[in-house]
Structure formats: structure tokens, C-alpha cells
Amino acid sequence: DALERLAVNDPSFEFEPETSDALGFGFRCGFLGLLHMEIIQQRLENEADIDLVQTAPNVTYEIVNKRGETISIHKPQDVPDPGDVEEFRQPIVRCNVIVPTDFIGAVMKLCQERRGIQQSQEYLGAQRAMITYDIPLAEVVYDLHDKIKSCTRGYGTLDYEMVGYEPADLCRLDIMVNGKRVDAL
């Protein structure tokens, strides 16, 4: 009920019910970023007096199975047996980072550590540059914006847009407890 009220007032907030063996019943929520997530969390705690358990953000991957069908994977438990998987695909975003020229090297290093592939570099004047990288969304959603702000002393900006899905070198890892496959914590 509290989530529905928030969704009515904030069309950018999405949620759907989900059940986990490890955590029980809950909701998978979609936000515009970490700040948006923190605001929603505070509103739920303050207005609805709800204690929340928050898990790390994740992204939707695609799998092409042996029959050539493309399947969206929202959680690790949905990954089919390895024998049924032809190819894993990860979401890629194009990141435009505007930085003071003094911090170009630090930002490039950070983007490369996040598996980014540089697309362009353009000087916007004597003091600023825009660096464009294609980076896996999983490397962006958690803290890339904060890291860019940190390594540019608050002067860097980041915006990104979805490019599509690209092949990824991934595999399924099962966690077994007492011989039974369980959800990852």
C-alpha cells in the first residue's frame, strides 16, 4: 500500500513483488539512481514506519539459448543450465563525463577500471573536456557517479544512456547449502 502511494506520486519509481529463499517476500524496485533510492527509502521509513532490508543494485542480463531465443534474466536464479546457454549478454551504457582538464587522467583510469571502452574525447574549452566511454551497466549503477565526483573534487558530471546488449564472458555460479541450491545473499 505504501509503495503504491509512492508510485502514484512518483512515476519514475517502479516496483514488483519478489520472493527469495534467503530473504522471504519483498519487492524489486527501480530507481533513477542512488539518491532517488535513498529518498524513497527515507519516505517509506518515515511515512509508513517500515523497516527495510536493502540489497545491492543489479541489472537485467540477456541470454541466448541453444534454440536461438533471447531471454531476459532479472536474477541469478533465472539463469538456465550451462548446457542450454549459447551466449550471455550484458547491458552497455554510453557514459559522457564532463571534467576539468586537470582530472582527465584520473577519470580515464577509473572508467578503464570499470571495463570501459573509450569512444571519444572532446575539449569544451581550455578548462573542460568531455570523455565518452561505453561501460557495462553493472559497473555504473552502484557508485560510478560518486567515484567520479570524488576523483574530480566534485567538479565532474556524468550522464549515460543505454546503448544495447553486448556479448559477455560470464558463467553461472551455484551456491549450495547442504546440497541444495540457494539464492545468493
Annotate each PLM feature.
Residues 1-185:
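Structural and coupling elements of P-loop NTPases
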